């Protein structure tokens, strides 16, 4: 297990600052990082080395907490503690801030694009989730403000193929939203974590959702459609989500991020104990009660809290991580034999 994660490269991405989050572009050729220095950096390869291709420093007045690429790869959205979200347009190696989205009362904690590229979601410490519509002229309009959470909303993520939105909060819950008529509504609340839910990730099929928490567990939730063979109760025509697996006893501190590889199904976590862990579903495990094994555990992946893990969308096994130590690390994950 010790050789399952091999360091490929390490770069001082945000020196003297925290590096908060990472996002690969859709082709897996560029990685965006953001940090407490108010900057966004774009990383790419030259030969065998990862180098900084661009620095986006003009958009925000405070910490940049999250970044997200549009599905077409031509835009990057950044969420900041200055209560704004910037939309950057890519022009070869340069990026220009073309729009600043305002409206949240305080820190914007996360931003995510829908798979169509026509919708954007943001969430904030003001307890709200906003859904924005993007038109052909690149104009952004808020079409819904969702106030389902009772505390700070930490993370938003879209289903990989449907317009289904999920959010994670300091109120210990995960909520799911869909469009009904002309508005967005909360269609499910996932309860079970005993403390803040920091991050969530859909599996490649979108039928399962992983959540990670301050309670040091990862929970796997499965979607059940009305009339399902397992007899899981559903409310009307809305699917039901049920916790089918809890990964506990593996992490010694808060789990800040969880990432589900869209190519292999491997599940990576970023933890406050400075470690990165990878889990794989056991072969032949029951889909209704899946079991997962720890296949990689790198104890000193960083010198401080690990904030984010991100699988490359095109190159299986390439994992990036970032930390309070300001560094970004690139790892090669080797799947154990027999899986």
Swiss-Prot record:
Keywords of this entry: Chromosome partition, Cytoplasm, Repeat, WD repeat
Signal peptide (from-to): none
GO biological process: chromosome segregation; iron-sulfur cluster assembly; protein maturation
WD repeat windows: 14-53, 59-98, 103-142, 148-187, 192-231, 250-289, 301-339
Pfam families: WD40
Presence of keyword Cytoplasm: yes
Subcellular localization: Cytoplasm
Cysteines engaged in disulfide bonds, as pairs: none
Cross-referenced InterPro entries: CIAO1/Cia1, WD40/YVTN_repeat-like_dom_sf, WD40_repeat_CS, WD40_repeat_dom_sf, WD40_rpt
PROSITE patterns linked to this entry: WD_REPEATS_1, WD_REPEATS_2, WD_REPEATS_REGION
Annotated protein name in UniProt: Probable cytosolic iron-sulfur protein assembly protein CIAO1
Annotated organism of origin: Rattus norvegicus
Upper taxonomic lineage: Eukaryota, Metazoa, Chordata, Craniata, Vertebrata
